[in-house]
Amino acid sequence: MLLTNVAATAASIPSIGPIRVEFILFALTLIGVALFHKKTMYVALIGLAAVLLFKFIFDPGFNLGHHIIGTAHEEGEWRILLNLLGLLFGFAILARIFEESNVPEILPRFLPNDWKGGLVLLFMIMVLSSFLDNIAAAMIGGTIAMVVFKGKVHIGYLAAIVAASNAGGAGSVVGDTTTTLMWIDGVEPVWVLHAFVASIAAFFIFGIFGAIQQHKFQPIISEIPTGVKVDWLKIFIVFFILVGAILTNFLLDFPALGVWIAILIGSLIRKTPWNELSKAWQGTIFLMSLVTIASMMPVEELPPASWQTAFILGFVSAVFDNIPLTKLCLEQGGYDWGVLAYTVGFGGSMIWFGSSAGVALSNMYPQAKNTVSYIKSGWHVAVAYVVGFFVMLWVVGWQPHEPHKKGAEKETPAMHSNP
């Protein structure tokens, strides 16, 4: 029953049954994205406007300035949004510079000349994302795929590229925003390492099926163009950009700053493909709109920390930004951080807008924005998520850590090795 008395107190915000209206507006936005995949930016902006209007009218405690900029006691969303903006634009330029270096042209020499070539490429992407940002790994992988498959990339293989970029970052505190957040919050890097057990198990599912899909759709090219010369200065610029991202991520928790310092310095050496910004802006605004909407959802608490909760959060992260989810889990405490790193990191691969890597890749391959086709052709990613999760639970078990936040509950579920 819709509540009508909304002015009395802040607690009287409208809901339909037990569901707050903000969640319904968010769900309608996601449905709109799925139905109108050629107009995703406009759908996301309409959804953002609707949620903001609702918050302004019905939520007395909402302050947009405090939400974005923050207060003396709590940081706002500005850092996440600014980093996201800088990384999506910056790595679009990086991918183009990498393509212009001609390295993708000579890669067929090092890749097997059958379906295993696509599998090796996915493995390379996964390794890259273990020490690079997953957006960079996805963009580099997508650039290579564009060349070695003559521009004909199966949507199932695109889903596999996104999955590989997220799988590699799951067990590394520098490979994904969620694991970096854990590290900053006090989670030890070794506590997330066993997420690689799940990632490797998942790779054998999405990697093999994705590579076979691609081989049937468009085999890897075997001939290498003659007279191709690698532009080593552009390779240096790519390397410089990646190093800049890693350094400023370590030192300032602001990888986008290092990316853009390196791009500007690199522009003094080689011409920078600034026109890539015009291709990436719609996808960037789309993701920033969804992240902003997600950050305004009234998620005050989660169910008790358990492997079941962590498993479900993986599916939630496919549609709900994993950054606020991770923040909430860190505040709650009591999780096995390796299990959570895998679920909230890899889970976003199941839908193209579930992770920043997927949105970045969709700027290069607009066909990935067809949500129905992505889910249908990328079915192996969801299967891989489930298989990887239970392999990790069987091999490593559920090993929760005591809450490291002051005031959090000190009791955690008993440690056990099987679900």
Question: Which residues are covered by each model-predicted region?
Answer:
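Helix-loop-helix module between adjacent transmembrane segments
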Residues: F91-R96, M124-A137, A164-S172, A198-G210, ...
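Juxtamembrane and boundary regions of transmembrane helices in multi-pass small-molecule transporters
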Residues: E100-V103, G151-I155, A159, G171-S172, ...
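Hydrophobic mid-bilayer segments of alpha-helices in multi-pass membrane transport proteins
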Residues: I19-L30, H37-N63, L81-I93, K234-L242, ...
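Interfacial loop-to-helix junctions that mark the boundaries of transmembrane helices
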Residues: A11-P18, L35-H37, L64-N83, P112, ...
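Low-complexity, proline/glycine-enriched hydrophobic segments characteristic of transmembrane helices
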Residues: M1-S12, G61-A72, L302-P303, G378-W379, ...
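Transmembrane helical segments that form the transport core of multi-pass membrane transport proteins
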Residues: V238-Y335, E411-P419
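Hydrophobic transmembrane alpha-helices that form the pore/transport pathway of multi-pass ion
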Residues: G117-A170, L181-D185, K327-Y342, Q367, ...
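Membrane-interfacial loop-to-helix junctions in multi-pass transporters
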Residues: G17-E22, I80-L84, F110-F123, F149-A159, ...
